[in-house]
């Protein structure tokens, strides 16, 4: 493992090292607010994104199946972060945080910080049912997930979506658009909780 540990968090008396963990919609919005408010001058900013794509619009994710690509879904142009002096580390997941030493840990190394923002977003709920780890059981959350769904649909005739929330219905519509006979199943425990 390459060690990128900095000996001290602060870069100079005028700037602080700010690490943003998460390059989704919230992490990107936070970075935009730093830029727009002029506060960026106070920080040396590094942003970690687990995904290989920079921040994109998850609300319109289903449009990926009808021709939009990662670039057209992106929340900013390819040069945005570089132009504003933000170091974006796409495809580099944070695996641990050492609060005592003020370090963020990834598979590539350790990164010191003075200030830390956690904007990790959410993860899809996968019901604890038999078969939930089968090859054809996929989640609908990221562009890579959609690539996997599209690939699986080429050899399928039916699709089942577990969950009838916004993303579940978007996923069902996407499966229909991929010419699959599609059913939506509500997960009973979650539905029961919603009714009580």
Q: Language-model features: where?
A:
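Short, conserved glycine- and acidic-residue-centered signature motifs
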Residues: 139-142, 168, 196
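Beta1-alpha1 glycine-rich phosphate/pyrophosphate-binding loop at the start
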Residues: 7-87, 174-195
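FAD-binding core/adjacent interface of flavoenzyme oxidoreductases
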Residues: 2-19, 76-162, 183
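Short secondary-structure capping/turn micro-motifs that flank functional sites
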Residues: 97-98, 170, 191
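Surface-exposed, flexible loop/turn segments at secondary-structure boundaries
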Residues: 53, 124-125, 145, 167, ...
